[in-house]
Swiss-Prot record:
Lineage: Bacteria, Pseudomonadati, Pseudomonadota, Gammaproteobacteria, Enterobacterales
Region (Interaction with tRNA): 150-152, 312-313
GO molecular function: ATP binding; tRNA binding; tRNA-uridine 2-sulfurtransferase activity
Gene3D superfamilies in the record: Adenine nucleotide alpha hydrolases-like domains, HUPs, Translation factors
Pfam families noted in UniProt: tRNA_Me_trans, tRNA_Me_trans_C, tRNA_Me_trans_M
Name of the coding gene: mnmA
Catalytic center residues: C103, C200
UniProt entry tagged with the keyword Oxidoreductase: no
Protein name (record): tRNA-specific 2-thiouridylase MnmA
Organism, scientific name: Serratia proteamaculans (strain 568)
Length: 367
């Protein structure tokens, strides 16, 4: 065991079970540990405020139990400028962004990393993400978490090897039930707390209500692939490719009894295009073009290569061939067609356990 007693780690404490156990595991490994609670959003209603206050109280209770200090910092301005405004712009353009990926890129592994190093004198930061770090030839790799159900490498693909090298991910070596068991043994208040779901700044609220506050909804027609108007949508931003629920056109059927799915968004004309059946050709893609690329090793691509890709979280890995088009764009060809490839979402690439990096889906390629 290397001597960690001179190394200071700041753990991002969210008030959840994963970050709680992260702090404990690092203590066990001999590090000097302190916590940091980040406030990334200025709440605008009582329910949100209560939820944030509970999270802070839980984080404080865990730190008290472990005998470590808890610092707090307000990153709401950085969050608004670097995550939220971009999120709204993407929705306005008819795309479906992933704010969690942006939050990791701009806040947790940038603002937090800088604050921990510069203001708190940290050697490392740590988070409760289910990923692993592997150091090879003085470069750090990002690996999938041991628990395949919980692996979060999809959300961390923008990290550089330098950022990975400054980060510790102890729960990535464990399965989730084991993490809960440790928390229960320690009698931490977060042991039975349910995992947070949804986008960090929306919490458990209805997404539609939230978006409607910031973007004016523009109703328009829902049109089938055959050109028939089958209903009205309340705003393209409320819909995503492959969506089935919430279209309000259940009774309308073509010749088949299959349910309707969103297969396209015509932003220029404010038309939502639908078709019946989850394997309708208009829903399937043979590949994609991705941009805003981030490779963990930060090396440029030299030519085509084989790997696997995920076009959304928790998807099965898809074997594919990646071909560089220029420095910031790649073409990806799947071995088999894939449903509901969604512009604005991220395509993340893997070689076995290693997360290579990824990019934003600019367009899908169809036959």
């Amino acid at each position: 065991m290397s001597d960690n007693s001179q190394k200071k780690v700041i753990v991002g404490m969210s008030g959840g079970v994963d970050s709680s156990v992260t702090a404990y595991l690092l203590q066990q490994q001999g590090y000097q540990v302190a916590g940091l609670f980040m406030k990334n959003w200025e709440e605008d209603d009582d329910e949100e405020y209560c939820s944030a206050a509970t999270d802070l109280a839980d984080a404080q209770a865990v730190c008290d139990k472990l005998g470590i200090e808890l610092h707090t910092v307000n990153f709401a301005a950085e969050y608004w400028d670097n995550v939220f405004e971009l999120f709204l712009e993407e929705y306005k353009a008819g795309r479906t962004p992933n704010p969690d990926i942006l939050c990791n890129k701009e806040i947790k592994f940038k603002a937090f990393l800088e604050f921990a190093a510069e203001d708190l004198g940290a050697d490392f930061i740590a988070t409760g993400h289910y990923v692993r770090r592997q150091d090879v030839d003085s470069k750090s790799r990002l690996l999938r978490g041991v628990d395949g159900n919980k692996d979060q490498s999809y959300f961390l693909y923008t990290l550089s090897h330098e950022q990975v090298a400054q980060s510790l991910f102890p729960v990535g070596e464990l399965e989730k039930p084991e993490v809960r068991r440790i928390a229960e043994q320690l009698e931490l208040v977060t042991a039975k707390k349910k995992d947070s779901t949804g986008i960090c700044f929306i919490g458990e609220r209805k997404f539609r209500d939230f978006l409607g506050r910031y973007l004016p909804a523009q109703p328009g027609p829902i049109v089938s692939v055959d050109g028939q108007t089958v209903g009205e949508h309340q705003g393209l931003m409320y819909h995503t490719l492959g969506q089935r629920k919430g279209l309000g056109i259940g009774g309308m059927k073509d010749s088949s009894e299959d349910p309707w799915y969103v297969v396209d968004k015509d932003v220029a004309n404010n038309v939502l295009v639908v078709a019946q059946g989850h394997e309708h050709p208009r829903l399937m893609s043979v590949g994609l073009i991705a941009q805003q690329l981030h490779w963990v090793d930060r090396l440029p691509l030299s030519g085509p290569f084989r790997c696997t890709v995920k076009t959304r979280y928790r998807q099965q890995d898809i074997p594919c061939t990646v071909t560089p088009l220029d420095e910031q764009r790649i073409e990806v060809r799947f071995d088999e067609p894939v449903a509901a490839v969604t512009p604005g979402q991220s395509a993340v690439f893997y070689q076995d356990e290693i997360c290579l990096g990824g990019g934003i889906i600019e367009q899908r390629l169809q036959e």
